[in-house]
Curated annotation (Swiss-Prot):
It catalyses: ATP-dependent cleavage of peptide bonds with broad specificity. This is ATP-dependent protease subunit HslV. Allosterically activated by HslU binding. The gene is hslV. SUPFAM superfamilies: N-terminal nucleophile aminohydrolases (Ntn hydrolases). It comes from Herminiimonas arsenicoxydans. The keyword Metal-binding applies. CDD domains: protease_HslV (cd01913). The active site is at T7.
Length: 178
């Protein structure tokens, strides 16, 4: 069976406001299975934003694990992310999961990968998924050359990615923390 794949998840931070959004397309091979999936969530009583890319079932498994790590570490984003990455790298079952997470709270944005990487973007812009580089490039240009809010930057950048990446559509879910 072919793997579900392809999406665009983008996070932009400006000042004390962060926005995280994603498109809604789910593909199986070369078929669009759904166009309105929610790949972005608020967790931990609305204090943390999470977006996921990769295999759908794998991503939900990781999302559940991440939420339990947040609870265990009282919402400390970095600690929960590092602990999830450790488990992901060392647990035989988790090691096979093909997904990535983009997480953010009021202070930090992190990309968590299946290789055990926990990466904090330098410029407050993080992106994952097949259209991530398109969205990240657009967001960087908009952040450096406009006064748009993070919400507006995410929306415009996801639209640009959707026009360029065949695995990304124009149906967006965007959440913010301010």
């Amino acid at each position: 069976m072919e793997q579900f794949h392809g999406t665009t998840i983008l996070s932009v931070r400006r000042g004390n406001v962060v926005a995280l959004g994603g498109d809604g397309q789910v593909t199986l091979g070369n078929i669009v299975m759904k166009g309105t999936a929610r790949k972005v969530r608020k967790v931990y009583s609305g204090k943390v934003l999470v977006g996921f890319a990769g295999g759908t079932a794998d991503a939900f498994t990781l999302l559940e694990r991440f939420e339990s790590k947040l609870e265990k570490h009282q919402g400390h984003l970095m600690r929960a992310s590092v602990e999830l990455a450790k488990d992901w790298r060392t647990d035989r079952m988790l090691r096979r999961l093909e997904a990535m997470l983009l997480v953010a709270d009021h202070e930090t944005t992190l990309v968590i990968t299946g290789n055990g990487d926990v990466l904090e973007p330098n410029d407050g812009i993080g992106a994952i998924g097949s259209g991530g580089t398109y969205a990240q490039s657009a967001a960087k240009a908009l952040q450096e050359n406009t006064e748009l809010s993070p919400l507006e930057i995410v929306k415009k950048s996801l639209t640009i990615a959707g026009e360029l990446c065949i695995y990304t559509n124009l149906s967006h879910t965007i959440e913010t923390l301010d």
